[in-house]
């Protein structure tokens, strides 16, 4: 079960994350989703990382940019998206966070980060830190059994695939990797938010292509 991994993530949060923030886990469709999206590492902009937050500890709660991306590629209902646009972070309730992730599940995708050690800001993490999370991420893949996995950015792609990856050189290229005897399919995509936001149009193009490939 995914929940059984959370205690391990909490221990790694104490080791590598901000002490005043909680680890952020994952969320979405957990039974053979069409796509598993793997981001880098959570920040304190996610209000679910606050210790006072007693709801789900899933990625991107209280933020806007990534939900705009999902809306633009057809993976978020307009009604939910309009509510997200109208809300400040503090306006998100536990119930609304659940509503958003019910919509994610309905659209058959799963959201996670390679790293789960929440930082106060979007500081870069060394490969060594991400490598401590790699086997746990592989375990997530094993549990949810996604059709395709999308890796955002060069660093995440390189660590998960075990090869030096430059997204600009492998756009729309299908990678295959065997993990515990099972073959998984991967695409490497530009990181679409934060420092990578200038690449968002290219990310959207490639994600639409991937969705079409997966769903036909």
Place the predicted regions along the sequence by residue.
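Catalytic phosphate/metal-binding cores of nucleic-acid and nucleotide-processing enzymes, i.e., regions
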Residues: 170-172
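A polyanion-binding, active-site-adjacent surface
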Residues: 1-148, 154-168, 185-186, 190-197, ...
């Amino acid at each position: 079960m995914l929940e059984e991994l959370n205690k391990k993530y909490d221990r790694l949060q104490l080791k590598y994350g901000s002490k005043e923030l909680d680890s952020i886990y994952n969320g979405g469709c957990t039974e053979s989703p069409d796509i598993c999206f793997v981001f880098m590492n959570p920040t304190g902009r996610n209000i679910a990382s606050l210790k006072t937050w007693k709801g789900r500890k899933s990625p991107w709660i209280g933020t806007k940019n990534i939900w705009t991306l999902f809306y633009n590629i057809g993976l978020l209902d307009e009604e939910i998206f309009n509510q997200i646009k109208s809300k400040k972070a503090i306006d998100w309730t536990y119930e609304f966070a659940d509503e958003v992730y019910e919509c994610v599940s309905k659209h058959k995708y799963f959201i996670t980060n390679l790293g789960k050690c929440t930082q106060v800001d979007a500081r870069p993490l060394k490969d060594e830190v991400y490598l401590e999370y790699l086997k746990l991420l592989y375990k997530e893949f094993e549990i949810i059994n996604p059709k395709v996995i999308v890796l955002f950015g060069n660093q995440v792609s390189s660590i998960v695939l075990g090869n030096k990856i430059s997204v600009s050189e492998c756009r729309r290229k299908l990678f295959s990797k065997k993990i515990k005897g099972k073959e998984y399919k991967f695409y490497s995509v530009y990181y679409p938010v934060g420092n990578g936001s200038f690449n968002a149009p290219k990310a959207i193009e490639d994600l639409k292509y991937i969705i079409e490939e997966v769903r036909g």
